[in-house]
Every structure is written in C-alpha cells, then in structure tokens.
Amino acid sequence: VYTSREVENPQSAARSKLTTLPSYPACWEQHKQAWEAAWDTSDILIEGDTQAQLAVRYSVFQLLIAAPWWDRQVSIPAKTLSGFGYRGHIFWDTEIFMLPLFIFTQPELARHLLSYRYHTLEGAR
C-alpha cells in the first residue's frame, strides 16, 4: 500500500511493486514466519482458563495488526482494524491502555507510538 506521503503516484507505485513480489507460496511462508516471531515475543499465557486465554490472545492480535510497524507518524486507531467507529481517530488514552504491551514485548514499536505524539505535538498546541 502506498500513499501520497511516500510517492507522487501511489497507484503507479503499487502496480510497479506487484511485478517484483515473490510467488504466493513464498509470501505465505514469510507471513507465517512473521506471525510466529510476533507471537514468540508478544504472547501472554494464562493457564487453567481457556476462555481468558482466547480473549487475551484476541486482544493482543488486534493490537498487533493495528500497530504502526512501518511508520513513526501514525498510531493505533480507537477500534483498531476491526471496527468502523470513530473513523480512525486516535485518542488520548492510547499510551495508557495500549503502550504497556509494546513496551514489554515490542520496544521499537512502543517508540513508534510515542513518536506519533511527538510528531503531532505542534498541531495539538
């Protein structure tokens, strides 16, 4: 995915990128490896309560899929990627409720979330 922040013509850049991508099986293998690595560092285990385990894993999954791995100037929207409410707005409490997971499991990503606040500080004033 390209936007006008990165390139002059996002549609053309996307078409060009498609010609250089590996095969679907190769992409699938990379995808699986990336998720294995993410779960290796971010999983939270709850013994003796399967329902709680599933709920926590679902929550961690939502945070991982919405986290801005690629960009220090965006943050996690209020309903992550699973809801349309709030139209992608970022709220003040991201750092209170979401940042702790990333501080302990994905420190570089935690830095990205804090960088978002730094980059938007002038607009907040």
What would you call each of these model-derived segments?
Residues 1-86:
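Acidic/polar, glycine-enriched structural segments that form the non-catalytic walls/loops
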Residues 49-57, 98-125:
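Carboxylate/His-rich catalytic cores and anion/metal-binding grooves
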Residues 52, 74, 90-94, 110:
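Active-site-proximal structural scaffolding
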Residues 83-89, 94-95, 100:
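Segments forming glycine/polar-rich beta-alpha architectures that bind adenosine-containing cofactors
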